[in-house]
């Protein structure tokens, strides 16, 4: 169960826009091994934990700490059971470091999803446009 304070989401977008272009330059696949995937289907893993993704690309440095302040103002509550059930994937263990707010992370193997993602407001305000990821 997660509770997000939506009035703080714009501040999180600003904080994210300061991090993404600094750590992502150009089109690449990401090592998501330490990032909670909320969608456990083997062929459609689309929803990843935003906090763990930012932590991973920054290696948990001072940029992450600054970003995390904005994140904590959005995610005011998050609790999960140790295991969850998916009709598609059965029982799975929750990553205890996950913080409950998911995001789509572009991948080179999903060009149509990436194109659709470019149309979202989050893409436009969170800094993805400044990473060079979508340039041909």
Q: What is each of the regions a protein language model found here?
A:
Residues 1-136:
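Terminal, contiguous helix-loop blocks that mediate binding/assembly
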């Amino acid at each position: 169960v997660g509770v997000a304070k939506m009035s703080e989401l714009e501040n999180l977008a600003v904080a994210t826009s300061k991090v993404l272009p600094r750590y992502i330059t150009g089109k690449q696949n990401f090592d998501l091994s330490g990032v909670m995937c909320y969608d456990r289907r083997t062929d459609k893993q689309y929803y990843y934990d935003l906090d763990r993704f930012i932590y991973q690309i920054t290696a948990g440095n001072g940029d992450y700490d600054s970003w995390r302040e904005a994140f904590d103002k959005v995610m005011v509550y998050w609790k999960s059971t140790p295991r969850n059930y998916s009709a598609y994937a059965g029982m799975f263990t929750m990553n205890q470091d996950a913080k409950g707010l998911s995001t789509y992370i572009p991948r080179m193997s999903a060009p149509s999803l990436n194109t659709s993602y470019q149309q979202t407001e989050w893409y436009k305000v969170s800094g993805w446009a400044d990473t060079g990821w979508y340039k041909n």
